[in-house]
Each structure stands twice: as structure tokens, then as C-alpha cells.
């Protein structure tokens, strides 16, 4: 077995198709294998195109493997540019989004990346719809668990607000050599996201995709039965429960109930004026339902010799597993891209992205909270409603609190305008200028609603809160980034030289204002102006600037001997001025 130059290929895999029989080639490229006369051999070797060869009764075969030029020429996105995968000297992983996305019903880029790249750990912060995830590269390497720097088209951005269908590829820079070009902010690695662009000389096309999926818990905690729970009270030496029930009496009632529950059709017994709960309940199942999720995406694109364009719109609608629609997430994405080759040496590009999201989750400041109560309350805790002094009141189960409480609402808007200008003075040199404006706003509202309920443990009427409270928080961030850099690439015989150098400037301003007030006049219309309690206000503001110079030099001899150096010098307003 040889290559196109007649050199023997050592260690190529040779397997009989459809069988487990196989071998590898030796130092001279030879192999010996017993096969049927009509066998087909599958031959594979890294960097070469796989082949299937028919034996056809022959005793000797001469096989020539061709180099897989597609693999050898594949490029990977790195800091401020691309490099041939074969010429990489640092630890870089790269994936094409279309290859890992497929038809998976995912709502965010973070979901897609779970398990998709070696060394990248994606961890969920919660199970609520639309919850953000955290990234970690090569494990935790500091006590603060620093996060990697995430860049979208060379600029910082929250990838959770991107539609996965708008992403072309993702590269992860894992080591210091690869991420040094981004300075100290890249100490925990870098995630580079490249979005989809229009393609020249392509016909107008429309693409539409959707996904529908259902969700439910795969495994829930199992609680002790009422009999086991009360027996545990007795084993601990408890004579009377905290609300007065006699433990021995309770045990006898439970044994009788387990033998013949029809004697207590209401699921409880009243002895000496004290209520004994007997029926086993499941608070977790009571507060859950089957979740439903749908995603839609439509895109149009095309181009001629000088202009290319792409536009897309996407929608995510996710209802969680908790009862009612107070456990939900909706997101709308719009993206527009255009590129024009005004002249052979100048190319402007414009990319505008907008995302709007709205999420709701059950909110209560009551003790335990929704999930805490579902786990902590015993399995004899009653469900539904209870009559107390002639008044029908909801019991303080998680199900009822979800229904009666107001949800915590989170509204986000994210506008990103990205402009790029590429100038090519001559063949081997490109000068690139990029400007990005990113405006992010968020409004968070919470309302502690006051309502009466029956406590399922002490059977008394209580209030959810002493005073209703309405709170609204507004955040706004304006981010500006400017990059200008030049790439020079030259090939001289077997020598390949690449030089890149540039300047980066970023500014970020953040403002937050929060206000709250208690004692709503109308619980159904919470508002700061429709309340009688005291105001409580607070605000925050932050501003910083970063400027940096960066470079990268690559050298390759005959594609076999590689040398790369890169670095960055930064100045930041976060540090005090030194002289």
C-alpha cells in the first residue's frame, strides 16, 4: 500500500467489509489477510480518502491511497482570523453547527454544545425554561471557577440570545498559546462563535425548520409513607406531634386506614378535636404536568458576483413541567446580513441581530419555596382545599401556591449592529476594520401577592405574606467595540509566512435602577403608584474601557515544521493610573 508519491503507508487499517477480521500495514506498507474470494476490503488511514477494494479472487493487491485534500485544507476559526487545521500548533477544537444540531429540539446554543466538544463542559444552572448555562474549559482551574471569554464574530456577546440556526461554526481555544491573543480576559479559554453569512453566486433559497417536543421528569425522589413517617416520630421518642396529635393514636389510625381506607373516605380522622392526616399524597406529581416545546426558524439567502445576503427569523416557545403557564420561556430572533464587493479591493459588510425574550417562573417569598415545600413536606400532607370555620381555603401546597402567586417576569431585549470593512491593497495583504454596537435591556418584575390559605400541618388560617410587595428592576447596557487589524500571508517556495497585528478598543456602560413598594390597593393590578406603603429605591452604574494591541506570527516549512507566536498588550480603566 502506497501513497501518490510511491511511499509506503505504515499502519493503515484493512478490514473485511461486514466482518470483524482485519489487520494493519507494516513498515513496508504490506499486509497479509485471509479472505473469501468475493470479499471487499475497507481501507482507512488518517489524512487519506478511505477506499473499498474488491478482492475478486486475487492473491496480491496494489493499493494507492489519495490524500484527503478536504481535510488537509479545512480551516479553523482562531483569534482574528482562520488557519488550516493541519497547521494548528495550539489546542483548538472546532465544530460545524449544522453537523451537531441536526434535528435536535434545542432552544439555545448552550444546549447544542453539551457533549459536542472534548474539553468543554456545559452545566445547567437550573431546570427552568430558558435558563442560562455555564461553560468550563478543561475543568475547574481556580477557586473562583472563572468562565471562558465568549466572542461572537470577534466581539463579546451573550450566546444564549442567539438562534442556533444562525450559527456557522464554533471554535474553542483551550490553551494559553491559542488564547494569548485575547490577553488576561482569556485566562480560562475562549469560545469563538461565527455566524452564518450570505454566499456569493448562489441562487435565492428559502429554508424552514421546526421542532415539537414534550418533556416530563424521568425520575423523582421517593418519600417515606405516612406510616413510615409517623413510626419514625415514635422511634425518635416523640409522644405528641408539634400540633398536638398523639403519635400512638396516629399509628393505630394509619394501620386501620391501610387495612380499610373506606372507613375514612376523606383521608383523615378527627379524634378529641385533633385532625390526623392518613392519606398518602404526592406533592411533586401534584405540581407537575407534561411540558411542551416548539421551535421555528425560517431563512432566505442568495447572492450574485458582487452582493450576498441572508435574513432569518426564529421563535422558541417553551412551557415547563410546572402546572399553569407561569413556568415558560419565549424568544424571538431576527437576523439580517448583507455584503457587497464594491470593488475588487474593498468589501463592506453589515450584520444586524435582534432578540427579544420573555420568561416567567413561579415566585413566592414564603418559607421553603415551591420546590423546597414539595420535597420537605411529609407524604401525608393534604392536597386541594380545606374548610376552616366555615370558609373554604386553599391548602399551602406547591400546586396551590403556583396557581395563586404572581410569577416573576423577566423581559430582555438585545440589539446588535456589526459593521465590517475589508480592504485588500494587494494580493497578500488584508486590512480589516470592525465596529459593533450592542444594546441590552432587561426588566425584572416580582410581586409578592397577599392571600389567605389553610396550613396543611397545623390546620390554621394564615397569610402568604404580611404585606404585599411589588418590585421592578430595569437594567441597560451599551457596549461599543472597535477592531482594526491586518493579515499578511506569503508563500515563498516551501516557506509559508503569516503575520497579523491589530488594535482593539471596547467601552461598556451599565445602569440599573430598582424600586419597590408595599401594600397594594388592588392585588390584581400591582403597581408602584397603586400602593400605600413606603418606597424603597436603589441604583447602580458602571463604566469601563479597554484598549489593546495584539499580534500573531506563523511560520511553516513544507507543511511539516511549524512555529507560532502571539501576544497582546492591554490597558484597562479597571486599574488605577500608575506613573
Q: What do the predicted segments below correspond to?
A:
Residues 96-100, 352-356, 568-574:
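Conserved short loop/turn motifs at secondary-structure junctions
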Residues 201-280, 316, 320-416, 432-547, ...:
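Surface-exposed loop/interface segments of Gram-negative outer-membrane beta-barrel transport/assembly proteins
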Residues 481, 548-552, 560-562:
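Short glycine-rich loop/turn motifs
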Residues 1-335, 347-349, 416:
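Short, small/polar-rich motifs associated with maturation and membrane association
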Residues 577-579:
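Short glycine/threonine-rich loop-to-helix capping motif typified by GTGT followed
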Residues 106, 293, 304-305, 339-347, ...:
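Outer-membrane beta-barrel channels and translocator barrels
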Residues 69, 194-196, 209, 299-303, ...:
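Transmembrane beta-barrel domains of outer membrane proteins
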Amino acid at each position: 500500500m502506497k501513497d501518490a508519491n510511491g511511499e509506503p503507508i505504515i499502519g493503515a487499517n484493512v478490514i473485511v467489509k461486514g466482518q470483524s477480521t482485519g489487520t494493519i500495514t507494516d513498515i513496508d506498507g504490506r499486509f497479509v489477510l485471509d479472505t473469501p474470494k468475493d470479499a471487499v476490503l475497507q481501507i482507512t488511514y488518517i489524512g487519506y480518502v478511505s477506499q473499498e477494494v474488491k478482492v475478486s479472487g486475487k492473491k496480491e493487491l496494489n493499493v494507492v491511497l489519495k490524500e484527503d485534500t478536504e481535510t488537509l485544507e479545512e480551516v479553523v476559526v482562531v483569534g482574528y482570523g482562520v488557519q488550516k487545521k493541519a497547521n494548528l500548533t495550539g489546542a483548538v477544537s472546532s465544530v460545524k453547527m449544522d453537523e451537531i444540531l441536526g434535528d435536535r429540539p434545542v432552544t439555545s446554543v448552550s444546549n447544542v454544545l453539551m457533549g459536542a466538544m472534548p474539553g468543554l463542559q456545559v452545566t445547567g444552572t437550573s431546570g427552568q425554561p430558558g435558563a442560562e448555562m455555564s461553560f468550563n474549559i478543561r475543568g475547574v482551574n481556580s477557586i473562583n471557577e472563572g468562565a471562558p471569554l465568549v466572542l461572537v464574530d470577534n466581539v463579546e456577546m451573550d450566546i444564549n440570545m442567539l438562534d442556533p440556526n444562525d450559527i456557522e461554526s464554533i471554535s474553542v481555544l483551550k490553551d494559553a498559546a491559542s488564547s494569548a491573543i485575547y490577553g488576561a480576559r482569556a485566562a480560562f479559554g475562549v469560545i469563538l462563535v461565527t455566524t452564518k453569512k450570505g454566499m456569493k453566486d448562489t441562487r435565492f433559497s428559502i429554508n424552514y425548520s421546526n421542532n415539537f417536543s414534550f418533556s416530563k421528569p424521568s425520575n423523582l425522589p421517593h418519600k417515606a409513607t405516612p406510616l413510615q413517617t409517623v413510626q419514625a416520630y415514635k422511634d425518635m421518642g416523640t409522644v405528641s406531634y408539634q400540633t398536638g396529635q398523639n403519635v400512638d393514636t396516629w399509628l393505630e389510625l394509619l394501620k386501620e386506614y391501610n387495612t380499610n381506607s373506606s372507613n375514612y373516605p376523606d383521608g383523615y380522622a378527627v379524634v378529641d378535636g385533633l385532625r390526623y392526616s392518613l392519606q398518602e399524597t404526592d406533592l411533586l406529581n401534584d405540581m407537575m404536568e407534561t411540558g411542551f416545546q416548539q421551535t421555528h426558524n425560517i431563512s432566505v439567502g442568495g447572492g450574485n458576483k458582487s452582493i450576498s445576503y441572508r435574513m432569518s427569523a426564529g421563535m422558541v416557545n417553551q412551557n415547563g413541567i410546572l402546572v399553569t403557564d407561569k413556568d415558560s420561556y419565549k424568544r424571538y430572533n431576527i437576523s439580517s446580513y448583507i455584503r457587497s464587493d464594491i470593488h475588487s479591493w474593498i468589501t463592506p459588510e453589515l450584520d444586524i441581530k435582534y432578540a427579544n425574550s420573555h420568561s416567567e417562573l413561579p415566585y413566592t417569598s414564603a418559607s421553603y419555596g415551591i420546590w423546597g415545600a414539595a420535597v420537605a413536606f411529609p407524604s401525608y400532607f393534604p392536597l386541594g382545599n380545606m374548610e376552616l370555620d366555615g370558609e373554604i381555603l386553599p391548602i399551602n401546597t406547591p400546586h396551590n401556591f403556583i396557581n395563586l402567586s404572581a410569577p416573576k417576569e423577566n423581559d430582555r431585549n438585545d440589539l446588535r449592529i456589526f459593521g465590517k470593512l475589508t480592504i485588500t491593497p494587494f494580493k497578500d495583504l488584508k486590512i480589516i476594520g470592525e465596529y459593533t454596537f450592542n444594546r441590552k435591556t432587561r426588566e425584572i418584575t416580582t410581586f409578592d401577592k397577599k392571600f389567605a390559605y389553610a396550613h396543611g400541618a397545623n390546620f390554621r388560617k394564615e397569610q402568604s405574606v404580611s404585606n404585599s410587595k411589588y418590585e421592578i428592576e430595569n437594567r441597560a447596557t451599551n457596549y461599543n467595540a472597535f477592531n482594526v487589524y491586518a493579515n499578511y500571508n506569503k508563500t515563498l517556495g516551501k516557506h509559508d509566512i503569516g503575520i497579523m497585528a491589530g488594535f482593539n478598543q471596547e467601552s461598556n456602560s451599565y445602569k440599573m435602577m430598582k424600586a419597590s413598594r408595599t401594600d397594594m390597593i388592588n392585588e390584581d393590578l400591582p403597581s408602584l403608584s397603586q400602593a400605600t406603603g413606603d418606597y424603597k429605591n436603589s441604583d447602580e452604574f458602571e463604566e469601563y474601557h479597554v484598549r489593546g494591541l495584539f499580534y500573531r506570527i506563523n511560520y511553516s516549512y513544507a507543511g511539516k515544521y511549524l512555529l507560532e507566536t502571539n501576544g497582546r498588550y492591554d490597558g484597562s480603566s479597571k486599574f488605577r493610573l500608575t506613573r
